[in-house]
């Protein structure tokens, strides 16, 4: 996951702080100098880092901290609180109109950011909440994008409105909203065209759609792997088109993660969701406090619980528990169990949410298998079980 390198560096810095019985002003300043370097290496915006360190230092170098019985923990607590504040303090929901009123959401972003896939993921989120979403293919320049949206929409059980590549995006948007009104859809999501870079034609097209269609929310999808470029892209879109929030994709990859720590501070716009994988279910609501906790190696147990609740049926869990107690746990139960683990993101994803088990924590001392190898072994085991003949005592 992104932040693994940053997390490891920060935890090593704080480990040294915790080892000191008392802290001097020089100790705090030396530690914060290392924190500053770690944040810059993670590609966090320089101005953001400078203000962050200043805020932490003002709070950390004080009588309450220095005279505390656990000054190291107090400094870590301050860093955690300032990091949460940096990323937005509280979770921001996408504002949706109540009942049958139609909410129009325009998705924007550069090519390769994962905008079309994210659009389908978002539609699935809304459907799960009881909304009736309509996906609209407004990318008339890339036929593959229309096909991709249609395929993913079908997988999510969401209707996709398309008029091919010979219509203007603004006309498609208008027709889609009329279709939504006539067919009781209450959430219209416009998948607009991406470009290889920010250009005037792209911006003007988005501005035209906003001017002619009552867009309620404009959401920008940015690739977290592009680091500071993601922040620059967000700033450009916000200045020229106006955005209401950001979705960060590919945060599960080997990225430095600086964009997540910079976007809110630079643009003033919240991060709404983060993409944590390629599956259509791999879209997580962004919680600043939970993300800060992950970065500092404190885990994210709440998200783990939510994933478990979403994937594991309570009655089946009790039934499985009873089987284990009676020594009746069989291969069918094992297959069901492994399926639930996979749906939660796999063993690596689960372990990363446990306190101290990120790469910067205790996990580095544990021999963990390669995720691809572990997945292959799991599939092999499942295939062996599926190939077994059912044995009965009457055979």
Labelled PLM ranges:
Residues 391-395:
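Conserved small/polar residues in nucleotide/adenosyl-binding loops
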Residues 6-138, 145-165, 172-182, 186-192:
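Primarily NTPase-proximal linker/entry elements flanking Walker-type ATP/GTP-binding cores
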Residues 204-223:
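Inter-motif core of Ras-like GTPase G domains
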Residues 357-379:
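Small-residue-rich helix-loop
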Residues 197, 217-329:
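Conserved phosphate-handling catalytic cores of large alpha/beta enzymes
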Residues 377-390:
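C-terminal accessory/binding modules appended to enzymatic or scaffolding proteins
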Residues 145-146, 197-203, 230-231:
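Conserved ATPase-coupling elements of RecA-like P-loop NTPase cores
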């Amino acid at each position: 996951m992104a932040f693994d390198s940053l997390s490891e560096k920060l935890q090593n810095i704080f480990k040294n702080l915790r080892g000191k019985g008392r802290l001097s002003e020089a100790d705090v300043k030396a530690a914060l100098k290392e924190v500053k370097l770690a944040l810059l290496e993670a590609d966090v915006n320089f101005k953001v880092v400078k203000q962050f360190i200043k805020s932490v230092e003002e709070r950390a170098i004080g009588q309450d901290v220095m005279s505390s019985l656990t000054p190291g923990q107090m400094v870590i607590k301050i860093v955690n609180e300032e990091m949460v504040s940096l990323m937005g303090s509280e979770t921001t929901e996408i504002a949706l109109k109540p009942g049958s009123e139609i909410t129009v959401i325009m998705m924007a972003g550069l090519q390769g950011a994962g905008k079309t896939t994210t659009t389908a993921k978002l539609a699935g989120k809304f459907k799960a909440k009881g909304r009736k979403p309509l996906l609209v293919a407004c990318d008339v320049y890339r036929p593959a994008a229309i096909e991709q949206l249609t395929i993913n929409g079908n997988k999510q059980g969401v209707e996709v409105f398309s008029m091919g590549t010979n219509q203007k995006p603004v006309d498609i948007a208008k027709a889609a909203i009329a279709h939504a009104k006539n067919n009781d859809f209450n959430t219209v999501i416009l998948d607009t065209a991406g470009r290889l870079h920010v250009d005037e034609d792209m911006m003007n097209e988005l501005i035209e759609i906003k001017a002619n269609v009552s867009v309620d929310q404009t959401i920008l999808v940015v690739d977290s792997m592009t680091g500071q470029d993601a922040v620059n892209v967000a700033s450009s879109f916000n200045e020229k088109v106006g955005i209401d929030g950001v979705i960060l994709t590919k945060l599960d990859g080997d990225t430095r993660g600086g964009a997540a720590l910079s976007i809110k501070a630079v643009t003033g716009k919240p991060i709404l969701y983060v993409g944590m994988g390629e599956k259509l279910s791999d879209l997580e609501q962004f919680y600043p406090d939970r993300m800060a906790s992950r970065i500092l190696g404190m885990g994210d147990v709440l998200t783990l619980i939510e994933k478990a609740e979403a994937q594991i049926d309570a009655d089946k869990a009790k039934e499985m528990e009873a089987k284990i107690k009676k020594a009746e746990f069989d291969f069918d139960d094992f297959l069901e169990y492994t399926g639930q683990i996979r749906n939660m993101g796999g063993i690596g994803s689960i372990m990363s949410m446990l306190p101290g088990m990120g790469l910067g924590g205790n996990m580095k001392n544990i021999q963990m298998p390669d995720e691809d190898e572990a997945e292959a072994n799991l599939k092999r085991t499942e295939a062996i079980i599926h190939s077994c003949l059912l044995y009965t005592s009457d055979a």
